[in-house]
Amino acid sequence: MYQAIYIQQGENYAKTVHLKDDNEGWLHFDYKPTYYKLNPNGEFKTLDGKCVSPTDRYSKDNYEIDIPNETRVLIEQYLEEDEPPKWHNIVFLDIECEIGGALTPENIKNSPTKITSIALYDKSTQQTICYILDESKSMESFEENGKSIIACYTEKELLLKFLDKWEELEPTIVVGWNSEFFDIPYLYFRMLKVFDHNTAKRLSPLGIIGNLSKYGSVATVETQKLTKDYLDLAGINHLDYFNLFKKYITKQEPSYKLGDIGEKYVNLGKIKYEVSLDKLFKEDKAKFIDYNIRDVEILIELDKKLQFIELTLNICHLCHVPYENIYWSTMLNEGAILTYLKRQGIVSNNKPTTINPELRLTIGDEYAGGYLKDPIPGLYSDVIDLDFTSLYPSIIRSLNMGVETLIGNVKIRDKYDSNWTLLDLKALRPSEKITIENPKRQVTQITAGKLIEMIEKNKLTIAASGGLFRSDKRSVVCDVLSDWFDKRVEYKNMMKDAYKVKKDPVLGEFYNKRQHAFKIKLNDVYGCFAQNGWRYTDGYKVISNAITLTGQRLIKESILEMNRMINTEIGTEDVDYVITSDTDSMFIRVGDVVRYRWPDLDVSDRDARIAKILEIASDYQKQINKYLNKHVRDLFNIQDDHYFELKQEVILERGYFAGKRRYAQYIINKEGVTTEELDIKGLDLMKSNFPPLFRKFGENLIQQIMFGKQKKEIDLLISSFKKSIAGREIVEIAKPTGVKKIREYIERGPTASKIFSDLKSKAPINTKAAIYYNDLLRFKKLDKKYPTIKEFEKIYYVYLKDNPYRLDCIGFYGVDDPPEIIEFIEKYVDKEKTFDSTFLNKLQGVYDDLKWSFPSLNEYANKFFVIS
């Protein structure tokens, strides 16, 4: 099975394939792609039913002219194989360099400062190595606790020793954190500066460094300007764990710094230090080495727990694509479907943007998303949810959606118009004129009666958007989704058998990875339909709208039916029991139903109450699925099986809903199993740009509310916290931020008679703070000793009280700042204003949601509280 692939473009369209196989090693061969031309006697059929024959001559009228060559080769060479290779040489890497300004792409390309250390871990040998620059020759190389520390007296020596080891290890996969943006490009360009291209290209086993764009084209760095796209070390797969993490863990993290992620997920953070990193390097090399190695150790522990590398390999081999394609669902799903069709002997169509290049200009056209019901903000108890199982894949399969089954659509009024189901058509006057269009965008009018007749006679399915699909043949996307569903079920059963019957955890984990790969693929197909350049979409987002608007209609109809059922049962009228809904789920408060069905139940008996709530959830799940079974057939004219099903997932003891996708949930039962979980998302109290102290307190405050603390206790927590602010270090309460623009907001710089710059009227607070810091640094003649704040750097800022300079705010780095400036900030920092401007309105927002009166936090009020 393949481990790496690189295709080298030669002269006159000649191509050389470099393919590394786990059994045969490196294979090198010339390659010419195969296209397919129309031929009434051709031995192959296309997806749209035409006869074709193979040819190696390019023509814009041929089929399969725009398939990436890497995908072509991998499908041809490994058509019947989906498994990952038996082995890989995986190396984890982290580099450190002297501080030399903001890490912009241009600065990385210029690579102005020395690389001071390189830490790596070879997974095959479990060997950790750190190459450390020691120009003072104060240390010798040594081994300790299984780690090799290699002292290098010049940067050249460090880089050459690293390259020697790199070539010895022969990595097939290199892993870092944000290494796509920084480590690998900086390493290459620094080698280019210190040595030459011949030395720098040793990073690639093929001696080729390419700049791989995110759309698959490759050019050498000599002919293409460095952009934010990553450098391609030809012959080595570069998997940036930062990007993998953001792909697989879709919930927003407060911070994506490696140390913060490490602490949260594997209880392993960065090595702490009190000075700047440059100063640490000069004054404490042992700690600096530990700092460098720790970054690699965090990566190792993250992958041990999350196993994203193994998951990536499983997905990419299922799809027959290079590993770097893992971030783009269109490439993955295109590869998977091409493989499926090739196994059937079917030739694929070209991309819509190849057939009609003008579609590239409409790539940003909008389409409707999922329906989110606005909650009435508040704290709710005894809440259940009902979730659609794989809603979007189920819509695609149930309505047989696909580019080859789409026959046309109703011309809708706007992207939210979801009232074109068969039931909607039947509610119109039969003579009412409706505008419809075919896949070629040709428009005509038809009466509602004639359209209904056409739908029913031809057994067409109709989406909520008015998209029309034939049902006499299955779309290839539906076939692939069905195949993936079946395989996922098969692997899940094999996983359970391995764990429970065979007692083989290794085999169980193997099957678990396989089923997880299929789960991910099932859930990301629908998004590809919105990409005009995806091979299996219509190019005009007709299918995308059909999917999302049908999803909207289903969740809305389900909400109406759920409210009708509860109101009917307990005798209320028009009461909304559905608190909120997301794209595929709804949260329902059932406390009134519990009290109605069991008026004598002791609600303080938690286990008894949960049992009754589970009974209610099971009952309503059966009722609403029975309703859906008939209703979806009437709505969408589904003749055969459909795949729509609502399932109860969780029970919340309490749920705080502040707005769309902004909530805290105290989960006490998950899929019928008792649990104790807090799920918090999107709340203002926990924003990533909050001071860490405030963010931590906000999280604790929400937890206490969810665990049932009363208002008086919450009041006391807030009052006590505000009082404690006075004794906190400034870095704890300062607001962390980035600075994007500095020069743009300076009207006039300082003069001999004026210390501070004149700023433009709309200068943001963080920019003002940075400029004032720089001006004060220069005024105190400290700018030769300490760096000024530059654009794109991370800083902190605070508000100031009345001070001799009449500044209202000031920024600082938070590490290794001049004592003179820190002394000034500590003397004049306005901690109360910092608290009020950053945090107070967020706290008041929570109280407003909970219908609580906000406590007075002044000193007079504090005497009524006992604060330890």
Protein language model regions, located:
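C-terminal, non-catalytic extensions of nucleic-acid polymerases
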Residues: 614-868
